[in-house]
Swiss-Prot record:
Classification via InterPro entries: Band7/mec-2_domain, Band_7, Band_7/SPFH_dom_sf, Band_7/stomatin-like_CS, Stomatin_HflK_fam
Superkingdom of the source species: Bacteria
PROSITE patterns: BAND_7
Predominant location: membrane
Localisation: Cell membrane
Keyword rRNA-binding: no
Cellular-component GO terms for this entry: plasma membrane
Topology class, membrane: Single-pass membrane protein
Official protein name in the record: Protein QmcA
Record organism: Wigglesworthia glossinidia brevipalpis
Family to which this protein belongs: Belongs to the band 7/mec-2 family.
Pfam families: Band_7
Membrane-spanning residues: 1-21
Amino acid sequence: MITTILIIFTILSILISIKIVPQGYHWTIERFGKYIETLNPGINFIIPFVDRIGHKINMMERVIDIPSQEIISKDNANVTIDAICFIQITNANNAAYRVSNLEIAIINLTMTNMRTVLGNMELDEMLSQRDNINIQLLNIVDEATKPWGVKITRVEIKDIRPPAELIESMNAQMKAERTKRADILEAEGIRQAAILKAEGEKQSQILKAEGEKQSQILKAEGERQSEFLKSEAKERDSEAEAYSTKIISDAISSGNMNSIKYFIAKKYTNAIKELGSSNSSKVIMLPLNTGDLFSSIISMSELIKSDKNVFKK
């Protein structure tokens, strides 16, 4: 009977002494109420009936929700703040025996420092510098929780809610700002369109003026060429007249009356032709002695037939 009791006691003692710690946890061992050691994940053995499990500490990173609270900003705006805190225990002994309730302590510490940090900022800074706020809170809370064996990995501001009337005012301000930007963009578009139109008209006027300039140049060049040709024609006529005069002079010197009659008859007929073809002529010119005219023409014919050397010269 006693042997059976001893066997049962021994088996029970062995079972009680075996402790299997799950992954991600550390267990503290107390002996007569005093901390002795920390059990790591896996199979561990303790002294039965003397040692006991003190605290089962979760060593994994976890999230603590920070309750919302109202904070008065530097510019006296009542703002409601929500936040979360990411923690990881690095020392199970300190987390179990240096603070009575670790989670509540971290919540109160975070809320206190949120009031301190955000209370020194204006509302616009709170809304625009959320990353800086997170960094400041992380540094402060992490430093304060080091003696507790806790590592603060992140502190995040979830929401910043100004009062309802202030939100309405901000919405009206943003709407006015968007309207202002839209008006500015529209005015800028109109200005650019006017500039492009004026530039196009300017280029058109330049091209038109350039075309007129080229036209005037070509016209002047044409007139110059025409005057040059007229001058050359007059010069040739003058040379021909001088040559004819020379021939007549030579004929007079040599006593050739046929050449003289030819020259006079030619001048006479040309003058009659010009007077007759003029549009403003109102007087009909007739020779005084038609017989002399006919005789001159006959003389011209005879002269042409008999004396071709005159024209060859």
